[in-house]
């Protein structure tokens, strides 16, 4: 039973938000991320190059942690020093402690994908929360199930709510929704 509604949440929430669905845990998200990397437009690559050159303040051809922090802030990402160092470690293939342009492109493509996944989940939440009260109730899920032709009993719907409802109020708020989606593997990269 649990796998049934996990697939439902993943497939319906992601397709409601324009995602690819997939139902295979995080496989659909990973597949979308790979396609997105391949589709990096020449314009986006040019913008990333301009940002790289702008923030490579010493002209070394690499970005160090201080330069990366400034770059990320300028691109709309507020990050702690620990997050900056972790980002560098994740893409720094040569262990230099700095990021060259190719490493920067890889990192920024991942960050853009994370932002896209969060936007998809936010859209999905709004679609499910039809009455716009900031919470998903059993009524919201039953309505969506009817609209999509998914035959769920009231007990199944309540079980779905209980699985995600951390504060015990009988509804799923936005934060609980994001945590639940992380548990089932959708958009795991941005958490």
Curated annotation (Swiss-Prot):
- Please, which domain of life does this record's source organism belong to? Eukaryota
Q: Where is the composition biased (Gly residues)?
A: 17-27
PANTHER family, from UniProt?
EF-HAND SUPERFAMILY PROTEIN, MYOSIN LIGHT CHAIN 1, 3
Q: Which organism is it from?
A: Oryza sativa subsp. japonica
Q: Which Pfam families match?
A: EF-hand_7
Single GO cellular component term: nucleus
Coiled-coil region list: none
A GO term (biological process) for this protein? Answer: microtubule cytoskeleton organization
- Residues reported to bind Ca(2+) 1: 56, 58, 60, 62, 67
Write the protein's name. Probable calcium-binding protein CML8
Task: Identify a single GO molecular function assigned to this protein.
Answer: calcium ion binding
